[in-house]
Amino acid sequence: MSMRGFARAGHLPTLIAALLYFDVSFMTWVLLGPLAPFLRDELGLSPTQQGLLTAIPLLGGSLFRPVLGMLADRIGGRRTALIGMVLTLATLFLGWQYARSAASFYVLGFFLGLAGASFAVALPLASRWYPAEYQGLAMGIAGAGNSGTLMATLFAPRLAERFGWAATFGIAMLPVAVVFVLFAWLARDSPKRTAP
């Protein structure tokens, strides 16, 4: 296995697009965790409510993964990812403009799980372009997008301190929108319907 062979074996633009999609999706998925102290203070949440606030997106992600995976198999990973990002943008918009109670954040958190289900789309989208000897590397590169959790943890509290927690949801829409455009431009479904 050589890096030169890897570069020629698959579709590098789709691999980059899958990495970016996975990255902003994971950033969005965990956004309530870094914002939980701000929401706790503003909404007067108990420790149990704060725990639910961070756990519900994980539940949503678990429940949405098989759905997005089946949808990707049916209509293709590219279209599924684009639909997922549109729904994620809508969820962030609702968090920015309308979510103001614990119950609304529980619902919001559940739908942020759509972003957490992204790896059921991103990994096959990238790996199906590569022969078996390179699929592990392709999935590893696309899977590095889980670094988005780090971006949320580093930047969300600072943004909330400076602009407020509600504006942080609006600001989070910006990288998702940029990746949406890049993804639409770069990503292509493999002509192979299933991985070897």
Question: What is the predicted function of each stretch?
Answer:
Residues 35-62, 103:
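Extracellular/periplasmic helix-loop-helix junction of adjacent transmembrane segments
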Residues 63-101:
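Conserved MFS/SLC helix-loop-helix module at the cytosolic interface between two early adjacent transmembrane helices
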Residues 106-145:
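Cytoplasmic helix-loop-helix junction between adjacent transmembrane helices
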